[in-house]
A protein has these predicted regions:
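A contiguous, low-structure linker/loop signature
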Residues: 82-127, 133, 146-153
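Short acidic, Pro/Gly- and aromatic-enriched capping/linker segments at domain boundaries
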Residues: 69-87
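Short, basic/low-complexity N-terminal boundary segments at the transition from targeting/disordered tails
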Residues: 51-74
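A broadly conserved detector of short glycine/acidic/proline-rich loop/turn motifs that flank catalytic sites
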Residues: 55, 98-100, 301-303
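Short, acidic Gly/Pro/Ser/Thr-rich loop/turn segments
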Residues: 58, 94, 101-102, 158-160
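Active-site loop segments of alpha/beta catalytic cores
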Residues: 1-52, 87, 121-377
Length: 377
């Protein structure tokens, strides 16, 4: 599909449905969210999309991990403070921490002391017994609308699943120890089949789901948890089997993987992921330069003045940016677009940098990126 030229009428504001039935102001976009995010994941965007927020997050209650993690988004109310936590699909107990708004497995008493125990100790979930029909009746056409880009989040991937069963130290040792790797591989093979079974049900019962957002953290603030060679050997083949299945069924695949993971990007590509959002400790421009023609990278403006970036918190940085003269905000937006928006090598805007999205920045980023992708600049 060729991208039409920018029309100034697109900058006209209109009322659109917002949160909790309220209306909000929006630009007059030429495509709805479903169609534009689809073009974005195909590396053919019409403008610079917003990673995560241009999608509808879907984490249905019927998948036990979503309740255990205190992260349920679907039709109907869910109160994480009173309902979050409990057992995941393997019976591992998670504790919801109200002060941080998330769940964790309390460390010190791992479900598995040794990965070789997985065959005897693990009880595999009966996916067929989950109330898929009831969830479909509640969500299809209401929460999951065809005009939206609906993205189901999957909370616990491969390495994260190993951590949930063995604690962090046990998981990293099992992954790296040659004596344990055969058992880890056998476990991951069966885990992949389970995940495919779950997504077979998702595809059958939720036909408006367009993409998967798959969680598997591989790094810390300063470094990856394990070498690229180890990831290539132990994790990538299983991820690739999963993404091949999803792609064969028309589902886009986005990886959520926290950490300073530049060294792992080639593994993300080999594993079949369509998109990845680096956290802000990463140099997103370098990642985009080196890999942006092979995987959709969520980027953010790295041309911020020191008076903004010297602030301690994201909220303080956002406030400092908002205090800049409007024309400077617009200039930064134009420079950002000119840096990372190229036909054939696009990006999308990172949710991690949402604190910089002032009205002036958003407007200028939209207009500039429409000019770029529409071929008039």
């Amino acid at each position: 599909m060729s991208v039409p030229a920018f029309d100034p009428k697109e900058m006209e504001l209109k009322d659109v449905p917002g949160f909790m039935g309220m209306t909000t102001k929006s630009l007059s976009y030429p495509l709805n969210k479903h169609d534009h995010m689809t073009t974005t994941f195909k590396m053919e965007p019409w403008w610079q999309a917003f990673q995560a927020t241009d999608a509808t997050i879907f984490t249905p209650r019927i998948i036990p991990d979503n309740v255990a993690r205190g992260f349920v988004f679907e039709a109907g109310r869910f109160d994480a403070n009173t309902e979050g936590g409990g057992k995941d699909m393997f019976g591992v107990e998670w504790e919801y921490i109200k002060t941080v708004g998330g769940s964790m497995v309390r460390p010190g008493d791992p479900f598995l002391d040794d990965i070789s125990e997985w065959r005897e100790k693990l009880v595999w979930p009966d996916v067929d017994s989950w109330d898929w029909e009831g969830s479909a009746a509640k969500n299809n056409g209401t929460f999951l609308k065809p005009e939206n880009f609906n993205q189901i989040w999957f909370q616990t991937g491969f390495y994260e699943r190993l951590i949930s069963l063995m604690d962090f130290e046990g998981a990293i040792l099992a992954l790296a120890d040659e004596d344990s790797q055969e058992d880890v591989t056998a476990f991951f093979e069966k885990l992949t089949d389970l995940y495919i079974n779950i997504f077979e049900h998702v595809i059958k019962y939720f036909p408006n789901v367009n993409a998967v957002f798959f969680h598997d953290d591989w790094g810390s603030q300063k470094e990856t948890f394990f070498s690229p060679a180890l990831a290539e050997k132990m994790i990538v083949p299983h991820m690739r089997k999963l993404t091949d299945f999803l792609h064969a069924n028309g589902i886009f695949c986005e990886l959520h993987s926290c950490g300073n993971n530049y060294k792992q990007v080639h593994n993300y590509i080999a594993a079949g992921w369509d998109a990845w959002a680096p956290q802000l400790m990463n140099d997103c421009y370098k990642i985009w330069d080196d890999f942006g023609d092979k995987i959709l990278i969520a980027t953010y403006p790295m041309n911020m003045p020191e008076e903004v970036m010297s602030k301690m918190t994201d909220n303080e940085k956002g406030a400092a940016f908002a205090a800049l003269p409007e024309e400077e905000q617009r200039r930064i937006a134009r420079e950002y677009v000119d840096r990372v928006c190229k036909p054939g090598k696009p990006s999308f805007y990172s949710f991690y940098a949402a604190h910089f999205l002032t009205p002036a920045f958003r407007e200028e980023m939209y207009k500039e990126s429409r000019l770029v992708y529409g071929g008039t600049k």
